């Protein structure tokens, strides 16, 4: 019996590795790309007489896009307004966070469906609980068993990537919080490598410098280094974060006292977040979310780290009023910068259900924003949305190209 082959013919095909043909064709067999290029050349060189042909001449075929920063368990909360007070927003967001396993599972499943239908092929999720991780793994196992994963592309694939177990722990609570984090990682079999075979990696995410002390960060980095886990954290996201690290006061000091009471271990660090964490960058692979507030010395520091990537979330950054992100300066300096959505809370609500229903979980909207606002080169945006994101996730970047042998995780736009 011959292996089923699919011939995709499109108005154009393109990736970030130099493939560009219009009209173009991609030949897929057993979930892998076996050939691509101009339609006439592909049909001449490859026997496609028995192939199932899909004509997409009004579409552009791209590799599946990479969302390198999302919060799937918040999906069912939906977009929320921001009135200018981060304190009020945080309290509102916390009050709406799903609590039960069923609520978390439903949110993750919906987030995965929305991500997939927006053209996302790979995704890094900040999992607020082990339930968010198991919900994602189980979704993959069910899709594998039924083969019923829906997609807008001709070759549907599950949303692979990384689920980062989120953790908190500052002041004198760091040791106890880290032990709880270790238990969570053990619960999802991240430390003994016995988790079910799925395209999901497990990572660890100390939340941010204002919610995790340096000992917590160090313990997470050591654990990740020993077990080959990636690390993600929110870094240099806001001016309030910079103020907290520098002088141990301001909004985040107030919130910590509100939730945990006085703690004499909170002392001024007199350091920028990048400088504060730099000694740990040599351990494990780091994904730094946001980096909205960095100067030349910090970009230089990041450029020296081969295992550090930055994920920029343009729409979410504007939502909170953060301006003038230096992603282009970072790219010019050699920093690997990719794109993310952040949570659905920070995304604009859909204007038109048919056209925009999946925008909140999509990377195309982030690319469109940077093109319209900054006139960023489309080739740069495509790299940020594909191969750069794959490198940041620690996944083979080839699978975000149209190269023969790459996974046929494709979208048509």
Model-inferred region functions:
Residues 1-47, 395:
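N-terminal metal-binding scaffold of metallo-dependent hydrolase/deaminase domains
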Residues 66-68, 123-125, 161-165, 202-206, ...:
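Hydrophobic faces of well-ordered beta-strands that scaffold small-molecule active sites
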Residues 78-157, 180-197:
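Alpha-helical scaffold segments that flank or form the walls of functional sites
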Residues 279-280, 325-413:
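His/Asp/Glu-enriched, well-ordered alpha-helical/loop segment
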Residues 71, 128-129, 166-170, 207-209, ...:
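Active-site beta-loop-alpha junctions enriched in small/polar residues
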Residues 134-284:
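Metal-coordinating catalytic core of metallo-dependent amide/deamination hydrolases
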